[in-house]
């Protein structure tokens, strides 16, 4: 679902922000 994809993308962005 779009909501799930958005949540997953937000999580990925958060992780990447911490890495870089």
From Swiss-Prot:
GO terms for cellular component: extracellular region. Keywords: Copper, Oxygen transport, Secreted, Transport. The keyword Secreted applies. It is found in: Secreted, Extracellular space. It comes from the Eukaryota. GO terms for molecular function: oxygen carrier activity. Belongs to the tyrosinase family. Hemocyanin subfamily. This is Hemocyanin subunit 6. It comes from Homarus americanus (American lobster).
